[in-house]
């Protein structure tokens, strides 16, 4: 299979076309480094203006979705030490958090002196059923599955809507995420949420889950009382989109907070043992790695060399971890 000579995109990925030099259309459309620097500055200043307007208006300035991974840990530190925000950290336990990640989370929130809540949905009656179905069925639109597996899409979808519920109820003006520059473009790094848009997006996610577990899924999504408070809908923000990103420097910085890489996690998810299994099922169903778009964007953006990018896209996974996940899911 041919790969783009500049990034790592394969020729059989949806909507990818190579020119006569073997360069993919995504690389040809990539913004110049200079223009990207301008956009980052623009969105960083936009965030600072919004902070100035929203700071101190509620019990917290921002609800940070904190997975315990390297990127969300670094984002948490940025929000506290650089932007000086009052933070409520929110961790969603999907049943596959490594023991070391629990230790990392405790170390970091204590070191940064941040309030923290952990939410663990029922596993047997909710998460297990959703993950089992997502392993075999597509569930979501093809466009969504180009960027993440159905399992990961389910998980992050629950995180988004639970965090949104908390933010509306507690009148917190921002919800933060640790998305890397490869996961989402800088132009979406600050997004004011509109109820009509959220309701439409909610249906695309909630509908498939409702078919799996029934009315119980309503617990994890918005109610009419939330939609009745449009002025309390927060901004979603992922600061790494407009920040300098250097993985080696990030790892060195968070090490000082008591963070260590857990055993058994792969290169793309330093907080979740389910990820390797999710990747494996996605590759077997669709023929491409679910992290392709993210890693290719990293390479194009200069955050990662092409050879390193290819190492982040392994087809073979840790069999011991994958088998353990299968057993827990009853597959």
Where are these predicted regions, by residue range?
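Short, glycine-rich nucleotide/cofactor-binding loops
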Residues: 62-71
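Nucleotide-activated chemistry modules centered on ATP-dependent adenylation/adenylyltransferase
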Residues: 1-62, 78, 82-331
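Hydrophobic positions on the alpha1 helix immediately C-terminal to the Walker A/P-loop
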Residues: 74-75
């Amino acid at each position: 299979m041919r790969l783009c000579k500049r990034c790592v995109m394969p020729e059989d990925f949806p909507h990818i076309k190579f020119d006569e030099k073997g360069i993919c259309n995504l690389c040809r459309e990539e913004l110049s480094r200079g223009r990207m620097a301008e956009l980052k500055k623009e969105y960083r200043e936009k965030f600072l203006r919004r902070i100035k307007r929203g700071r101190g208006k509620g019990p917290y300035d921002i609800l940070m979705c904190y997975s315990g991974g390297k990127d969300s840990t670094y984002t948490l530190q940025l929000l506290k030490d650089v932007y000086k925000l009052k933070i409520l950290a929110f961790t969603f336990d999907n049943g596959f958090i490594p023991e070391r990640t629990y230790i990392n989370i405790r170390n970091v929130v204590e070191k940064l002196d941040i309030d923290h809540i952990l939410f663990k949905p029922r596993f047997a009656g909710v998460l297990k059923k959703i993950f089992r179905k997502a392993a075999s069925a597509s569930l979501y639109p093809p466009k969504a599955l180009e960027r993440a597996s159905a399992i990961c899409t389910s998980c992050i979808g629950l995180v988004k809507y639970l965090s949104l519920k908390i933010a509306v109820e507690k009148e917190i003006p921002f919800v933060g995420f640790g998305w890397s520059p490869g996961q989402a473009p800088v132009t979406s790094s600050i997004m004011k949420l509109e109820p009509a848009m959220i309701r439409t997006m909610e249906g695309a996610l909630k509908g498939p889950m409702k078919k799996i577990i029934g009315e119980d899924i309503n617990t994890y999504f918005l109610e009419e009382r939330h939609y009745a408070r449009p002025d309390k809908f927060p901004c979603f923000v992922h600061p790494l989109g407009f920040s300098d990103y250097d993985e080696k420097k990030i790892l060195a910085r968070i090490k000082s907070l008591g963070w260590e890489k857990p055993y058994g996690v792969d290169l793309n998810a330093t907080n979740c043992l389910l990820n390797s299994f999710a990747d494996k099922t996605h590759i077997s169903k669709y023929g491409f790695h679910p992290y392709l778009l993210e890693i290719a964007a990293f390479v194009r953006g200069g955050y990662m060399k092409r050879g390193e990018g290819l190492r982040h896209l392994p087809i073979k996974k840790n069999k011991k971890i994958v088998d353990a996940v299968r057993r827990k899911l009853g597959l």
